[in-house]
A protein has these predicted regions:
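A boundary/linker detector
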Residues: 1-24
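C-terminal catalytic domain of Rieske-type non-heme iron oxygenases
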Residues: 15, 37-38, 62, 133, ...
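Rieske [2Fe-2S] iron-sulfur-binding domain
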Residues: 16, 32-159, 201-203, 340, ...
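A short, structural micro-pattern
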Residues: 24, 119, 126-128, 254, ...
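Short beta-strand or tight-loop elements
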Residues: 26, 49-51, 121, 211, ...
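Generic N-terminal leader segments that precede the first folded domain
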Residues: 28-30
Length: 414
């Protein structure tokens, strides 16, 4: 049973918490590049790990992520003037650069060196794949940015979207490692009862790795073959899932790198970075965003009961939620648990094997930071910074075959 103390440890992410301190040791998404599209464009509010921040793009195109409140007397920098390579507070004109240096204090005497004694809270940023990443931990411990597959992928072979979730991040990411739910929640054809009977209870395995963990699910396709999916969990709250298999389990080369980023304890930004080996069309890109509005709120949400169609539920789909992508159905399942689910009330079975393993990995990592030890997957050696082969893997094997025999199981998965 998951204890109340363990639940608190994994779900609280503010400054000074065990999980919050852990997440701050990694490069994590802060916002999409498109939210601050041009030099000197209006700044935007960013709430991240229970901290209120302001993101802006300066005159040279550099991105800054600052504490929202001016170091002078606390006025919000959201209303500031973004000009001449800095963000200037509208109250007394204090001006900050992207690194938090105080460039100007015009209300102070001309000969004052007051500004040289100050440093506003600012977090380093890096833009990759249409996402602004930030590092919020100790500067002296800042790791290298991990060189995942998408770091050097052409823009036309990937697209990214984010969505707002009204629940704790852990509820969301646990769904990525709950293989058995896909048979039911995402079933779009009730007539396919054979499929429900065939793969409702997959064989599950979990294996620790230097980057976190990988989850393995094995479904029997008959007496002589099985379908295998291997999904990595990557510290601190990332996952990779393969593209959906067709009804005939044909190949689909798409894969999605997913980030579950806490806004605070009870809300989450969910980023989906989708990749494949051929370019995406403009129509495909538009469709991939059609389930969120201009603020990245989901069209189907708790306020409209996820637009569930009860008649459709009776006759067609298992959930009655006619989603553009499965994540919309996942949102209903995870948000309806409440803001932070009390895991002391759950009753876990075999189908939760990989979720239990995921929690164990996170607990060990959080406790490592509590005890002053380094958590896993902090990249510090440039020679070891190559994760381009780290992917989700899927394939069909003989019934008695091992998942380790999959041809795409590269060194990066180890």
């Amino acid at each position: 049973m998951f204890s109340r103390e363990e639940n608190e440890l994994l779900t609280r992410v503010g400054p000074g918490t065990a999980m919050g301190n852990l997440m701050r040791r990694y490069w994590i998404p802060a916002l999409l590049s498109e939210e601050i599209p041009l030099p000197d464009c209006p700044p935007v509010r960013v709430r991240l790990l229970s901290e209120d921040l302001i993101a802006f793009r300066d005159s040279n195109g550099r991105v800054g992520l600052l504490d929202e409140h001016c170091s002078h007397r606390g006025t919000s920098l959201f209303y500031g003037r973004n000009e001449e390579c800095g963000l200037r507070c509208i109250y007394h004109g204090w001006k900050y650069d992207v690194e938090g240096h105080v460039l100007d204090t015009p209300a102070e005497p001309a000969d004052s060196d007051f500004k040289k004694k100050l440093r506003h809270t600012a977090y380093p940023c890096r833009e990759v794949a249409g996402i602004v990443f930030t590092y919020m931990g100790p500067r002296e411990k800042m790791p290298l940015f991990p060189a995942y597959e998408w770091v050097n992928l052409p823009d036309n072979r990937m697209h990214v979207v984010k969505a707002y979730l009204e629940c704790n991040y852990l509820q969301g990411i646990e769904g990525d490692f709950d293989s058995s739910h896909t048979t039911f929640l995402h079933c779009s054809n009730l007539a396919d009862l054979a499929r429900l009977n065939r793969d409702g209870a997959p064989t599950l395995e979990a294996e620790a790795s230097d980057y976190g963990m990988r989850a393995i699910s094995i479904r029997q396709l008959g007496p002589d073959k099985s379908y295998v999916r291997i999904s990595p969990f990557i510290m601190p709250a990332f996952s990779i899932v393969p593209g959906p298999a067709t009804a005939k389990f044909e190949e689909n080369d798409s894969r999605a790198f997913r980030f579950w980023i806490p806004i605070d304890d009870t809300s989450t930004w969910f980023y989906i970075l989708t990749m494949r080996d051929t370019p995406f069309s403009a129509q495909e890109r538009a469709s991939a965003r059609s389930w969120v509005d201009s603020r990245y709120f989901r069209i189907r949400n708790a306020g409209n009961n996820y637009l569930q169609d009860r008649e459709h539920q009776k006759t067609r789909s298992y959930s009655g939620i006619n989603a553009v992508i499965p994540a919309e159905q996942d949102g209903c399942a995870t948000e309806s648990m409440g803001p932070i689910y009390d895991r002391t009330q759950e009753h876990l079975g075999y189908s939760d094997k990989t979720i239990i393993a995921l929690r164990r990995v996170l607990l060990q990592a959080a406790k490592s930071v509590q005890e002053g030890r380094e958590p896993p997957h902090l990249v510090t050696d440039p020679k070891l910074n190559d994760f381009s082969r780290l992917r989700a893997v899927k394939g069909v094997l003989p019934a008695n075959g091992s998942w380790r025999e999959l041809p795409d199981l590269e060194e990066g998965m180890v």
